[in-house]
Structure formats: structure tokens, C-alpha cells
């Protein structure tokens, strides 16, 4: 009889083991729905900036109210958590926001200011931002001054990309952003990243130094390049509260001039002081003896070539900047950690593999409006945690407000 009981127990154990299956691969942890028109593969490295959404707007209508949104950069600290700043301000569409940073733990955090200050990342991957918000400046075509003192601008009105501050990452993977937000084309301060991956940003906004040439003219570039963000050990992303503006230069006669964006056609000046721009963005205009500036007749196809790029903001990249890549719907940071929505609905970077109990680790995309999305959702929530906001994909409490995570290209400055 005892022998029969042993056989039965063995049979039951075998059946139980046969029914057990290991957890599914993390790359399959993806939402069932996808964002219409979303890009799941992006060719270049990019960062993110936190753009608050009006609390009276629904998630479905949020994309149509971009012009009334205040933008702040998110930061990431080392543990991979993503956090945002605590104050918001209305800015124009595509206004420049501070880039977010990441610390070591991968957490993403944003500061309480919505200035365009760059964000940093600490070791845990958390992303954090500063607490202040400021209005951003819109970037217009650079103007030049001729010998008679007249100030003229080019004839082409190209739509340059707005410059946002780069974000940084700390060791834990948390992402944090600065507390101030700038309008389009404003330059944000660079952010750093610590070991845990958290990203955090500073709280002040500062303009880049200007230069002066012999005649006293002051010149500045037309692109407001934002400082890149840094990352600390835990992966958290944090951003500084300062925003750095593009430096301007001054020439000998005291006139102040700004450089043109690389996407805009170069303009030339002729003897009579008139300034003319070429119709082809890749061709420079010529100058004749009477001072008139003339442009080439070829039409530019550059706008059409870049029209499919959903990202229209740029930021300077520095050491520790929160650098993200999107391939096949999988989001990774500069340390190769996986961007995921963890069990408490927080957005952070971990692994690989992602944190145990992660809900989503794939299914990321960039929407046609240039916002980061998970599945068919591009609305995230910044929830106050001390002096920073953590970022979540769902509303989890009264201290949470909806935001968009705007993608920003990172460039070497």
C-alpha cells in the first residue's frame, strides 16, 4: 500500500513539473495595441524631454494641444526610474525643453522647474527633473548686418528643429529633468548621469556666452543647441535647472549677428547692403559688386527628405548624457539597459533582463508628433516624490499630472 502511495505521489509530481513553464522572454512583454504611425526603429541616438499636458485634456486630445503645453526635461538616475520637474508653464509648440538625465539605477526623474535645463542620469536609472518652469524662445532665421547699419534677414522661413537640453543618466537608471521649461529653440543646460541610472537636472537656466568681433557686432547661431545630459551609476536620469543658450558672437563694428542653422541656406551680402537667401538650402548665395545678395534658382528637397522624421528638437550631448536607442520596439539606454514599465507602473531602465515583475519591456515607439509611446499610449504621468517627479504610464495618485515625453536628437556641440 505504501508503495502505491509512493507511485501516486511521484506521478503527481511529474505531472506538476510537466505543467510548469518558465516565464516568457522579456522581449515579449509588450502591449497588445500599437500606436498608429509610430516609429519602432529610430536610426540615431536620442533623449527625452518632459512636456506637461493640460489636466483638463484627455489622453486622446493631448496631441492636439501641444501649443499650450509647458515642456520640461526629464532626468534619469542610476536605478532607472524616470522623474519629472514639479512646475509647469505654457509654451509654444515644439518649444525647447531641458533634456533628461539618467543615474545609475535607471530611474527617470524630472525637476520641478520646467526650464530647458539639461537633465542627468544617476546609477540606478531613475529619471528626475528640476522644479522650475520658464517660457522658451522661438528660433528664427539668423539676421545679418551690412555696412550701412541696416539689419536684414533671409527670405526663406525654414522650420528648424527646436533645441532641447539633453538629459543625463545616473547609475540606477532613474531619469530626472530640470524644473524649468524653455520655449522652442532655447538651449538647455547639460545634464549628468550617476551610477544607478537615475537622471537628474539642475535648477538654473543660463545663456551661453556671446562673442564680440572688432566692429562691435554681436552674433549668435540660429540654432539653440541644448547641453547634453549625463548619467550616473544607478541609471536614474536627472536634469539641471539651468538652461544654456547658444553662444553669440560680436564683430568689430558692434553689430550683433547670429549664425544660420545647418538646414537653412547660407545668405550672402552685396554692396548695397541687401541680404538675399538661396532657394536651395544646400547652396550658398553669391554676392555681386552692387551689394545685392542673390540666391540660386534650384529648389530644395531637404524639407521633404526630413519630413518623415518625427523628432524636431535637438540637444547637445555631453559625458553622461542619457542616450537612448530604439530598435524593433525595444528601448535601451547608453548602458544597454532595457527601458521598461515595472511592477509599480514606473518607467525606468534595468538589466538586461529588465526588473523582475516588469509589465512591459518592449512595444516602444516614437509617435508622428515626436513623443515616446508604449503600445498605443503616449501619455505618461509625473508623480511628485519629494523634490522630483517619478514617471509612470498610469495615474497612480493625487500628486500625478499627465505629460508627454518628447524625443530629442542628441548632437555633438
Curated annotation (Swiss-Prot):
UniProt-recorded name of the protein: Cell wall mannoprotein HSP150
User: What is stated as this protein's family in its record?
Assistant: Belongs to the PIR protein family.
> What function does the entry list?
Component of the outer cell wall layer. Required for stability of the cell wall and for optimal growth. Required for resistance against several antifungal and cell wall-perturbing agents and for tolerance to heat shock.
Pfam families, per this entry?
A: PIR, PIR1-like_C
GO MF terms on file? ATP hydrolysis activity; structural constituent of cell wall
Give the lineage.
Answer: Eukaryota, Fungi, Dikarya, Ascomycota, Saccharomycotina
Q: Where is this site: Cleavage?
A: 72-73
UniProt-annotated location(s): Secreted, Cell wall
Amino acid at each position: 500500500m505504501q508503495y502505491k502511495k509512493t507511485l501516486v505521489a511521484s506521478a503527481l509530481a511529474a505531472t506538476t513539473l510537466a505543467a510548469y513553464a518558465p516565464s516568457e522572454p522579456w522581449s515579449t512583454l509588450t502591449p497588445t495595441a500599437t500606436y498608429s504611425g509610430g516609429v519602432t526603429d529610430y536610426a540615431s541616438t536620442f533623449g527625452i524631454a518632459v512636456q506637461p499636458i493640460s489636466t483638463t485634456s484627455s489622453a486622446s486630445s493631448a496631441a492636439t494641444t501641444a501649443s499650450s503645453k509647458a515642456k520640461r526635461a526629464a532626468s534619469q538616475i542610476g536605478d532607472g526610474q524616470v522623474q519629472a520637474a514639479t512646475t509647469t508653464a505654457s509654451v509654444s509648440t515644439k518649444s525647447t525643453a531641458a533634456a533628461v538625465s539618467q543615474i545609475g539605477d535607471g530611474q527617470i526623474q524630472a525637476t520641478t522647474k520646467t526650464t530647458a535645463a539639461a537633465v542627468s542620469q544617476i546609477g540606478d536609472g531613475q529619471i528626475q527633473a528640476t522644479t522650475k518652469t520658464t517660457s522658451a524662445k522661438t528660433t528664427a532665421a539668423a539676421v545679418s548686418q551690412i555696412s550701412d547699419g541696416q539689419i536684414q534677414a533671409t527670405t526663406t522661413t525654414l522650420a528648424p528643429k527646436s533645441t532641447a537640453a539633453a538629459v543625463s543618466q545616473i547609475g540606477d537608471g532613474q531619469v530626472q529633468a530640470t524644473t524649468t521649461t524653455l520655449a522652442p529653440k532655447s538651449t538647455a543646460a547639460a545634464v549628468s548621469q550617476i551610477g544607478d541610472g537615475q537622471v537628474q537636472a539642475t535648477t538654473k537656466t543660463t545663456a551661453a556666452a556671446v562673442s564680440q568681433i572688432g566692429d562691435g557686432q554681436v552674433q549668435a547661431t540660429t540654432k539653440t543647441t541644448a547641453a547634453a545630459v549625463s548619467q550616473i551609476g544607478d541609471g536614474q536620469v536627472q536634469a539641471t535647472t539651468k538652461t544654456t543658450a547658444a553662444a553669440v558672437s560680436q564683430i568689430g563694428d558692434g553689430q550683433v549677428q547670429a549664425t544660420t542653422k545647418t538646414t537653412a541656406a547660407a545668405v550672402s551680402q552685396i554692396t548695397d547692403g541687401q541680404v538675399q537667401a538661396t532657394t536651395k538650402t544646400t547652396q550658398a548665395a553669391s554676392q555681386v559688386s552692387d551689394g545685392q545678395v542673390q540666391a540660386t534658382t534650384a529648389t530644395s528637397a531637404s524639407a521633404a527628405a526630413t519630413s518623415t522624421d518625427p523628432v524636431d528638437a535637438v540637444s547637445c550631448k555631453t559625458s553622461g548624457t542619457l542616450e537612448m536607442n530604439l530598435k524593433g520596439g525595444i528601448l535601451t539606454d547608453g548602458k544597454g539597459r532595457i527601458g521598461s514599465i515595472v511592477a509599480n507602473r514606473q518607467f525606468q531602465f534595468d538589466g538586461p533582463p529588465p526588473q523582475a515583475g516588469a509589465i512591459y519591456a518592449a512595444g516602444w515607439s516614437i509617435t508622428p508628433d515626436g513623443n515616446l509611446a508604449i503600445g498605443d499610449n503616449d501619455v505618461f504621468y509625473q508623480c511628485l516624490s519629494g523634490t522630483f517627479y517619478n514617471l509612470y504610464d498610469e495615474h497612480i495618485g493625487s500628486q500625478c499630472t499627465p505629460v508627454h515625453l518628447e524625443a530629442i536628437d542628441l548632437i555633438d556641440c
